A protein has these predicted regions:
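Glycine-rich phosphate/diphosphate-binding loops that line cofactor/substrate pockets in enzymes
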Residues: 13-15, 37-49, 91-97, 184-189, ...
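Phosphate/pyrophosphate-binding active-site segments
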Residues: 4, 10-30, 169-172, 196, ...
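Thiamine diphosphate
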Residues: 139-150, 296-298, 369, 451-528
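Structural signature of the thiamine diphosphate
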Residues: 2-6, 10-18, 49-50, 94-131, ...
């Protein structure tokens, strides 16, 4: 039911696309000149075209191999800070659902990057982080510097918020460790991994051919399918509910998940609330009830689709007392479809508060949502009068959606709002929208306290890579989003908080250096 603009349909590009770096052929994989050449062989085999880095001597062997053996592929992006390098990879992963390489120097570069790694972990972003240490061979260490920049078990510094880390002891261990790291990283739920290489191991001459993985080997396990019997129960609950709500958070990590949710909503004619970790559902769709909190008092069933944060949308926080009030009607039922406890860590508390679920289903929503749609269609087909009843519900939702969007857009042109200083979020969102609305645009992260989401026409999956994260993350992730769309010729818009940029103003140099087009609209709140 959602409509697309001309730009979304691909009839217009904002600028000339910049093609991806072309991968050169390496004829003798596993038999280069130096051990670090084997790492490059694996990077070529796993097809990751970019590597964001801040150079350091601990991986000078790998750096040399990337240039002289790998033909400068992956393309190396010089960054002003390791944190920014990881954030660029984070934004790229958000926008493409594919991993990117970030390379960090020794212990100090790893420690510089660890906040960005933590945010990638809690945001489930697949980032292949390469680091280096040592030399562990004491006789090869340079005075002082190699001693103070080396740690025993260096991966321990980020082990609590990465999915996997490894440090191969021999060159023959490099391919298997790399392959396992990639598999762990890309198995849902995704997350960053850290691969550490000893400095002297990289620089030693390769004296034998290393056994490489078969090019036909499966790199990642198949997606996890949910239990059919439990899915049938969920479908019956969804069909019998008077006012169900689909609560989506990470189901939009892929185009397939986005499209599947549209089909499910159109089948069931029910409300959808997008928590915006990724763009899960079109903002222009008449069943999109995101940011319309008054609907919660009518909801009798919530179906979470790859949702971690159940509490924030379903409760009202009283900040002064740190207490919460439920928004939900008494007797509302809850069904959780996603990865449940598979990501849980004994260290990080990102798993949120435990909910009283009526059904809990483990499975990938890329599979579960189409399965749920099929089951619901079968129930509709054999239940007389149900289809017209559902369509009537959909019409009421569409009326509320249209009314709310009209009110939001009026707020952006309201005379009193336009006199406020600093500029009101609704006004700034409106002004930017009037300039970009006929382009094929992408919003990188922050949405001006969701006013861009209220006013702009989010009519395609690529429009938004997901909501903003913590302070000092937006400019870096925005560059990664812009890099991901660089070959599409789209207009990339970053609604940039001023205080966030001050953490890493050098990021703008990275954009200029590596030809990453992006419109940065600075929101200065006159504070920080």
């Amino acid at each position: 039911m959602a409509t697309k603009s001309k730009a979304a349909s691909g009839n217009k590009t904002f600028r000339k696309p910049i093609p991806l770096p072309k991968k050169p052929k390496v004829k003798k994989a596993g038999a280069g000149r130096f051990n670090s050449d084997v790492i490059v062989d694996m990077l070529h085999m796993y097809d990751m075209p970019f590597a964001a880095l801040n150079p350091g001597a601990s991986y000078r062997g790998l750096h040399d191999s990337l240039v002289n053996y790998g033909g400068n592929w992956p393309y190396m992006m010089l960054c002003t800070h390791e944190e920014t390098a990881v954030q660029i990879a984070h934004g790229y992963a958000r926008a493409t659902n594919k991993p990117m390489v970030a390379i960090v120097h020794n212990l100090v570069g790893l420690l510089h990057s660890n906040m960005a790694i933590y945010y990638a972990y809690i945001d489930r972003a697949p980032i292949f982080i390469i680091g280096a240490t040592g030399p562990l061979n004491e006789t090869k260490r340079r005075p002082k510097i190699d001693w103070i920049h080396t740690a025993n078990g260096q991966g321990a510094a980020v082990r609590e918020y990465t999915k996997f880390d490894a440090q191969p002891a021999t060159v023959d261990g490099v391919p298997e460790a790399f392959a396992r790291a990639y598999s762990v990283m890309m198995t849902q739920p995704n997350g960053p991994i850290y691969m550490c290489y000893d400095a002297w191991l990289q620089e030693e001459k390769l004296d034998h051919k290393v056994q490489m993985p078969s090019p036909t080997a499966v790199k990642v396990p198949a997606k996890m399918s949910p239990d059919v019997d439990t899915m049938e129960k969920a479908a019956k609950m969804l069909m019998s509910a008077k006012f169900p709500l689909l609560l989506a958070e990470y189901s939009g990590r892929s185009q397939e998940g986005y499209d599947a949710l549209v089909e499910l909503a159109d089948t069931v004619h029910c409300a959808v609330y997008d928590l915006d970790a990724r763009c899960c559902f079109p903002g222009v769709h008449p069943y999109n009830m995101s940011m319309i909190d008054e609907i919660f008092k009518q909801v009798d069933l919530v179906v979470g689709l790859d949702t971690q944060d159940w509490e924030k949308p379903t409760t009202r926080l009283i900040s002064t007392t740190r207490t919460r009030e439920s928004k939900m009607a008494k007797g509302c039922k809850f069904v959780d479809i996603g990865f449940g406890e598979l990501k849980i860590s004994g260290w990080s508390l990102d798993y949120q508060r435990m909910m009283d679920f009526d059904q809990r289903i483990i499975g990938d929503t890329d599979i579960a949502i189409p399965m749920l749609t099929k089951l619901c269609k079968a129930i509709i087909a054999k239940t007389p009068g149900l289809k017209s009843k559902l369509e009537a519900r959909g019409k009421k939702l569409a009326t509320l959606h249209a009314k709310k969007r009209a009110n939001w857009r009026r707020a952006g042109t309201d005379a009193a709002q336009r006199k406020l200083t600093p500029i009101a979020h609704a006004v700034l969102a409106t002004e930017v929208w009037e300039v970009i609305k006929n382009e094929d645009w992408v919003l990188t992260a922050g949405a001006l306290e969701d006013w861009a989401r209220r006013i702009w026409d989010f009519d395609a999956h690529h429009r938004h890579a997901g909501k903003s994260l913590g302070t000092s993350t937006q400019i870096g992730t925005s560059l990664g989003v812009a890099l991901a769309h660089r070959d599409k010729g789209r207009l990339i818009v970053d609604l940039q908080p001023d205080g966030d940029l001050m953490f890493d103003a050098g990021s703008l140099w990275i954009a200029a250096k590596h030809n990453i087009p992006m419109l940065v609209v600075m929101y200065n709140n006159r504070a920080y």
